[in-house]
């Protein structure tokens, strides 16, 4: 079987490596960080998504359930008013831990990859256009949100601006609180899992204001009793929503996977499911590009209407109208939670493959 190079040991890169190694390919993964888990300043951090765990196992061949927990408590703060989500829908929201700890999803995937003979080389950054050009054809690129990859490969993106903090908690609850307010046209959140806590406020395209960041910090401290002392600005982030044409499986003579390939919800940025499933699609592309393209097309078919919906929402709904619209929707949500969650999950890139 062939030698395959993968750039990035995140979710999609490792799923691709596991699949290819299982088929007899010799796989080398180049990871810029010194250990598994991605950007150390971010980790460990919990991250949530709707999952069909059995469907993910069937599609990828990897059981991620040991690293996944159902979200027990969820609420949304909309311009200062709190709305509790029942979390009784048939489609469940799960949380996974990202990072290098034994409880992290990254570690689970890394251990599975190594057990199948995958060679992961740490401290191997691939950053510049020249770096990428030197890689062999059919190299799989899985570099996620890193700005340098978008610029080196000339892939459209929206810059991400964030303000985040992490810490620990004295409980083991899996919970999330989302924040919508005048400090961002996107949102922020606070979450806990496995005894760690994480909070972030982010916005695409426009930097966050100093006043907005301070307001969010105060709200998290008051509402969640979370007095973080290590708030930092997120630097160098990018997301593949710079163009309606962002989704791509092939780029030149390379294969693109994960967030970089555009398998992400352009409205709320849910992308973990797409990262996992697209890893398997990238692996498929090594042996059968036509079949892989058909799977990728199915995975990303909801990207385009959601991209248009987000653009229309930002253009046509003024800030003054967002508060009553959001509050009205959240008041109605518990009564139609099952239907809403089903439709929401069905629009996340990748869900229709399960």
Cite the ranges covered by each PLM segment.
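Predominantly flavin-linked oxidoreductase catalytic cores and closely associated redox partners
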Residues: 9, 103, 107-228, 262
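FAD/FMN-dependent oxidoreductases across multiple families
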Residues: 70, 208-288
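Short beta-strand to alpha-helix junction loop
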Residues: 48-51, 87-111, 207-211
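Glycine-rich FAD pyrophosphate-binding loop
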Residues: 9, 21-43
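C-terminal auxiliary extensions adjacent to catalytic cores
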Residues: 311-354
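N-terminal FAD cofactor-binding segment of flavoenzymes
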Residues: 37-79
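Beta1/beta-strand and adjacent pyrophosphate-binding region of the FAD-binding site
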Residues: 1-12
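Active-site-proximal substrate-binding core of FAD-dependent oxidoreductases
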Residues: 246, 268, 284-323
